[in-house]
């Protein structure tokens, strides 16, 4: 029986843990929280007391004699995953690739070398440097982005004519969210946002789905919903797919899932970033199999174990979407209307708050 090592056992990792058990694999999970929901579902649960500690987690992988490692829907321990693959000669990305795929500056450099479609991007030295670059080298609005972070945390739009004091506040926020304390300033692409869900096997990227995204407005662009399949014209979808494939090749991805984020401006696709893992927000774990009929979770598990994935539809195809309902900031008084969640068109629903909780502002 093959052993799969899952880094993380939170809500977003639970579908992967369940699927791997269903597929007959022995599943080991490591999470610093012993009460993480996936810890009770695995064959063996380990609390490493430092999931990002390469030496500690590598020692666990060696001791358990694992056959593959996966870090679904998260980037926190991607370097650890790459190191394990290198040391144990396993399927999946190398540490070098993991570093490139989790550092947005190195990612932009890789896109530029390969010719993958990418907006103008400059690594800043500090807040004053960023302001000068914005004033002197950008004739359009721009984006401040943490060099190392996943999701939308720390990302903010900066607009021409805004006060320097406001710019400085947004810069400091991006800096605080960056794990390497570096911030990029990038050309702002005016247009709709998408993601492309991909499985890379033996160096070849295979597109499974194109996702239409719904976000909040500037400055933070927090993701509030996702729709599959895309309703955009076929020509636009082809450009998105081509951009995603070029980006995966530019990063040197191999034997992994990929979540590729792009925008369209004036008919042209631009890569925002690529994660060398399944997408969060239940895009890869739920939406993709509902819309495409392809079991992306099973495919990602198999490529991590060095097994050829089944990329043919095995289920009926549906239109599917997910929405995150975010009340205004403040104290939550009551939750009403939950009866609608029992309707036939609702595949799944979760409520993460309860009356009395404090609802924060939507900025990440």
What are these regions, as identified by a protein language model?
Residues 2-3, 141, 184:
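Residues that mark the start of a beta-strand
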Residues 155-269, 278:
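Internal nucleotide-binding/catalytic subdomain
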Residues 86-154:
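A conserved helix-loop-beta module that forms one wall/lid of the active-site cleft
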Residues 1-97, 128, 309-310, 353-364:
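ATP-binding N-terminal substructure of ATP-dependent carboxylate-amine bond-forming enzymes
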